[in-house]
Amino acid sequence: MKLTILGAGAWGTALASHAATAAADHDVVLWGRDPAQLAGIAATGVNATYLPGVSLSPRLVCEPDFDRAVDHALTDPEGLLIIGTPVSGLREMTRRLAARRKGPLAMLWLCKGFEAETHAMPHQMVHDELNALGVAPGEIEYGVLTGPSFAKEVAQGLPCALTVAGTAHVLIDRAQAAFHHHAMRIYGSDDLIGVEVGGAVKNVLAIATGASDGLGLGLNARAALITRGLAEMTRLGLALGGRVETFMGLAGMGDLILTATGDLSRNRKVGQQLAGGKTLDQILADLGHVAEGVRCAQAVAALAARVGVEMPITRAVCAVLFEGLPVADAVSQLLQRDARDE
């Protein structure tokens, strides 16, 4: 099975390494925008920029030429293309892949969030681009691979379980053939809306939980934020067309728990450091990586307003990030909300 992962960040690299190790017949290529970075990975077996100190599969092949990397997967009728860029790069990648295809194409993306300008979900962005290009339904099957997963742990071969949701079951079958090996479990879903809402909203809620922990508010407060945050996520997802069971699964509750409590979470770190008095600009400069919760917080709040869903925790995060509200004041406002039924 031939696979191409487009994007040599932490998650793209980790997944490529796992796939290369997963089965003897897997032929995996990793492409990235920086040829020097790819050369370093090929020479040392380590992605020193995003996964320092973690040894990658020796069977992983780095390919700096985009067309050759894409053609690698396209030459296999059972091949799979994985887009490992942030949400902001998804439209461009979709256009480039559609232009390169020679027949049916199967692709997945790894990004989580909503588009900042349009508030579109990733699958809506892809659908719009393919429709504008005149691609007929079924010519390109697409979907998302998501769930509770830190890239470093995946690259280290530690156990995890993920969800793949797509436009056709053949895509789920290919994703399971590619990744459902050794320590990784892949579960299928047809609820693209639900899994994408879960993947976006959990990042915003992780900022809130990190801020609570940064203020030293305790484990009770953490549990309350996660639980009430899950309620916010579910309300929004149902209003947008998702299914309730999705939010009780890996792409909802599972990803929220991991991102809100795990110390490898960039979004959690943002909240902790905001509580510690750092400015958002300082925090993002220090991180050096994408924190999707910051990027999509306003989009989540705008979507909620559009469909009439109340999301007080999300609104508080936006006020802290973009309106200068001190973290302690945001907590105070949440605690002063009127009593209500759960």
Swiss-Prot record:
Binding residues annotated for NADPH, in chain numbering: W11, R33, K112, A151, R266, V290, E292
Cellular compartments annotated: Cytoplasm
Protein name as annotated: Glycerol-3-phosphate dehydrogenase [NAD(P)+]
Gene Ontology, cellular component aspect: cytosol
Active site: K202
NCBIfam families xrefs: PRK00094.1-2, PRK00094.1-4
Binding sites annotated in the UniProt record for sn-glycerol 3-phosphate: K112, G147, S149, K202, D255, S265, R266, N267
Pfam family, one: NAD_Gly3P_dh_N
Record keywords: Cytoplasm, Lipid biosynthesis, Lipid metabolism, NAD, NADP, Nucleotide-binding, Oxidoreductase, Phospholipid biosynthesis, Phospholipid metabolism
PROSITE patterns in alphabetical order: NAD_G3PDH (PS00957)
Any one GO molecular function term: NAD binding
Catalytic activity: sn-glycerol 3-phosphate + NAD(+) = dihydroxyacetone phosphate + NADH + H(+); sn-glycerol 3-phosphate + NADP(+) = dihydroxyacetone phosphate + NADPH + H(+)
Record function comment: Catalyzes the reduction of the glycolytic intermediate dihydroxyacetone phosphate (DHAP) to sn-glycerol 3-phosphate (G3P), the key precursor for phospholipid synthesis.
Family of the protein in this entry: Belongs to the NAD-dependent glycerol-3-phosphate dehydrogenase family.
Keyword Thylakoid tagged: no
Enzyme type, top EC level: oxidoreductase
Pathway(s) this gene product operates in, as recorded in its UniProt entry: Membrane lipid metabolism; glycerophospholipid metabolism
UniProt lineage: Bacteria, Pseudomonadati, Pseudomonadota, Betaproteobacteria, Burkholderiales
Organism whose genome encodes this protein: Cupriavidus metallidurans (strain ATCC 43123 / DSM 2839 / NBRC 102507 / CH34) (Ralstonia metallidurans)
E.C. number: 1.1.1.94
One GO-annotated biological process of the protein: glycerophospholipid metabolic process
